[in-house]
Amino acid sequence: LETDRAMIRDGLVWRIYADPTDGTPARFVQQSDAALPVFHLAPGAYIVHAAYGLSGTTQRVVVGSSAAKETISISAGALILNAMVGDSPIPDSKVQFSIFVAVGTDPEGRLVADNIKPGALIRLPVGSYRVVSTYGDTNAITSADLTVEPAKLIKAILRHRAATVTLKLVNNLGGEAYAGTNFSVLTPGGDTIRDLVGAFPSLILAEGDYFLIARNNGKVFTSEFKVRSGIDQDIEILAR
């Protein structure tokens, strides 16, 4: 790794390509994932590509008739990401991360990696990134701008303001929920966020105000509710 000159002992993939002199594409020769690979090559010019996670570098080497040793530097660092609501870690099954690099003025211009789970070690080229954390599958999304530094491991926690709500259509508060109810969750402005069907479907929502519509047996019922971060709750609509 650049800066500290520490040898990388795992996570490497080496690929060797013959470097042709006639203008034809480089030809793959050998591959290894050893930290200190030894390649037996005929004399000639070669392109060495070293991949370290999502970062990598390429170097041209010329092999003679005697043994030679090459050292290649990679400008890379790493991230470990986690997410929380309040003081509680979010279960791995309910959150995932995506990493972007900016293109022009768009901080999420190009996707670098997605479907990243908490605690995973993500090796990246040195640079600035937008990390997006998605909690659940509705609108609980938060982001952070992080800088990957040479030979550094950055551990980041993204904090969500969200909660789980369970929707119910009932005759009386605390009563049995109607099966087969169609629910629509909307913003106060009337934009649909999510449609669900069932007696008591659950979803994760960002903190804020919402409007709920329940349809059952040809009848329509409505209600307003508020989501407070970290406070899971049942949202009951009275069928009357």
Question: Locations of the language-model features?
Answer:
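Structured interaction patches on ligand/partner-binding surfaces of diverse proteins
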Residues: 33, 52-75, 136-161, 217-240
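Short, acidic Ser/Thr/Gly-rich low-complexity loop/linker segments typical of extracellular
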Residues: 18-35, 102-119, 187-200
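Solvent-exposed strand-loop boundary residues in beta-sheet-rich modules
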Residues: 18-22, 52-54, 87, 101-105, ...
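C-terminal functional regions that serve as terminal interaction/effector modules
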Residues: 136, 173-196, 202, 211-219, ...
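A short, amphipathic beta-strand motif
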Residues: 1-6, 78-87, 164-173
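Short, structured motif recognition centered on aromatic/hydrophobic residues
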Residues: 10-17, 46-48, 74-79, 91-100, ...
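Post-signal-peptide, soluble extracytosolic/periplasmic N-terminal scaffold domains
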Residues: 5-13, 20-22, 30, 36, ...
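Short Pro-Gly-centered beta-turn/loop motif in secreted/extracellular proteins
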Residues: 33-47, 51-54, 116-139, 199-218
